Amino acid sequence: MNQDTICAIATAQGGAIGSIRVSGPEAISITSRIFQPAKAGKLLSEQKPYTLTFGRIYNGEEVIDEVLVSLFRAPHSYTGEDSTEITCHGSSYILQQVMQLLIKNGCRMAQPGEYTQRAFLNGKMDLSQAEAVADLIASSSAATHRLAMSQMRGGFSKELTDLRSKLLNFTSMIELELDFSEEDVEFADRSALRKLADEIEQVISRLVHSFNVGNAIKNGVPVAIIGETNAGKSTLLNVLLNEDKAIVSDIHGTTRDVIEDTINIGGITFRFIDTAGIRETNDTIESLGIERTFQKLDQAEIVLWMVDSSDASSQIKQLSEKIIPRCEEKQLIVVFNKADLIEEMQKEELSALLKNFPKEYTKSIFISAKERRQTDELQKMLINAAHLPTVTQNDIIVTNVRHYEALSKALDAIHRVQDGLDSHISGDFLSQDIRECIFFISDIAGEVTNDMVLQNIFQHFCIGK
């Protein structure tokens, strides 16, 4: 149990209203020392929980501000401790004055994520729910918001609890059998155990495979913009982002390194990657940039191959052997840029250049990035190419790398159990693998997580959370 009382500003600078959170055993008494209710009578410490009290913050006899104080009593608060929230005017001077008074009277400044860490340590939420708080704060689309809300409300935690219950049931049957091994008593039918192992494997496997979707939703669908130099890659990136992110020049090889940025299109976050133009060069730095281009191409889920319409035949012939083999299981959109410089009849001829491309994942479009023609249509194609499901708050989709790694290890363990059952190995070995699986599942919820891991998780939160 935490014996000290913490405080922190919970709102961003520049707003009309500011909020300071105070939590810990002395939260109410420390707040009472600097706060005087406007209505004479009840002191703050005598107020009922979940009440708002209007009054003034004093530094000695000087009034600092007129404020509202919210009161929460343990264990019915966010942290599970006695807590107050002081809502004042948003002046940075006022907020700092109130903070200094709280610290002078016994509070200490909260560490990043300490409020949520205390909520976890006090049993108000498990670790996966605590991590979802950070995801909710960082959410930038409807899908990321829904996934974070689902996890924070305990949807993922319930899935883990059910999974852990099945695993404990499994291992208890195995270990009970081991206790009576000398009496040759079989408590669990091996076919029934195999059926249970299959059920567990299906659940874990579904969660592991959901990470590809979850990671794309959370961090953005990776879209690599590739092509020869001066095909218009940087111009397209600037148009999509609606800002001059990349340098645009007629000089070949201007973009020498990878430029990344994200944008929300139709409720989906896309992570665009503008790459160095592909060409033969003796420039060492440019060569490194081209090498990174192919690395980013391999990592992308959608590839925008920018082709200069006035030189399309040559570019497609030169680069198709390098690009097409790398685009298997990706979505490839061939973007014929500078289409305003060619005749309508030429477009049919250029489209025919793609006749040997794999039709199942290849699309094409004619645009003019400079004139912003057909760029809206390109955005629609990106949405269709993303193939992301419509997400609801009831969906259980893994978005956290730590969870994915733990689930992957749990999946390996349950696979060993399945193989062991098929091979009729001893229950001792089966029990060991099952317990390993339980360990990794429990690690996600924070039931077996060490202090170093906790510190690493919560230090990425903002101070007031």
Curated annotation (Swiss-Prot):
Residues that hold Mg(2+) according to the record: 234, 255
Protein name per the record: tRNA modification GTPase MnmE
TrmE-type G domain: residues covered: 220-387
Cofactor details (free text): Binds 1 potassium ion per subunit.
Biological-process GO terms, alphabetical: tRNA methylation; tRNA wobble uridine modification
GO CC entries: cytoplasm; cytosol
Domain of life of the source: Bacteria
UniProt KW Protein transport keyword: no
Enzyme class: hydrolase
